[in-house]
A protein has these predicted regions:
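Terminal, non-globular segments
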Residues: 1-170
């Protein structure tokens, strides 16, 4: 019995470990170097899904700390990614509290809203408080590929949730 409980704890921390790994490893930057225009903000997809389905797996403090780590690794001013992730948490929490039954279509639409506000805050703060330059075409590609890969990761995370974590939605 204790062995099963221990395995469940490991499976429950899987998304959190993946979030920290993604923030430390610069996977997004490496994908952009391999594929010319393919860039993906996988952290936002991960945070949004698990805040909607199982918020106790990813606490707000962990997400904020992961944002700080991401800022240090990527060379952004400290706190910009964290604030962007907190916007994702805010929209996800609002949707979770106001909806009775979530579907992939409703999650996808609300993810678009969350991503727009999150990126708007991120790039306006980055533009006003740093000397880093960015092109709007890269932002557009990032939003496009993140939005259209969301259903794929939604299905993969649902399979992970049903098979390993448990099917209990909030």
């Amino acid at each position: 019995m204790a062995k099963v409980s221990f395995l469940n704890k490991i499976y429950n921390t899987g998304p959190l470990i993946l979030l920290y790994y993604l923030c430390i490893s610069e996977v997004d930057t490496n994908l952009e170097k391999i594929f010319e225009i393919f860039t993906l903000n996988f952290q936002i997809i991960l945070i949004y899904f698990w805040i909607l389905k199982r918020p106790e797996i990813m606490a707000n403090g962990h997400i904020f700390l992961a944002g700080l780590i991401n800022d240090v690794v990527m060379g952004f001013p400290l706190g910009i990614s964290s604030l962007s992730y907190l916007i994702i948490i805010f929209v996800g929490t609002y949707v979770r509290n106001k909806s009775v039954n979530t579907t992939i279509a409703s999650d996808w639409f609300t993810f678009l809203v969350a991503m727009i506000f999150s990126n708007l805050l991120f790039f306006s703060l980055l533009n006003n408080f740093s000397d880093l330059s960015f092109s709007f075409s890269k932002i557009g590609y990032n939003m496009f590929f993140t939005l259209f890969t969301f259903p794929i990761f939604w299905l993969l995370f649902n399979i992970y949730q049903i098979s390993l974590v448990g099917n209990r939605d909030v």
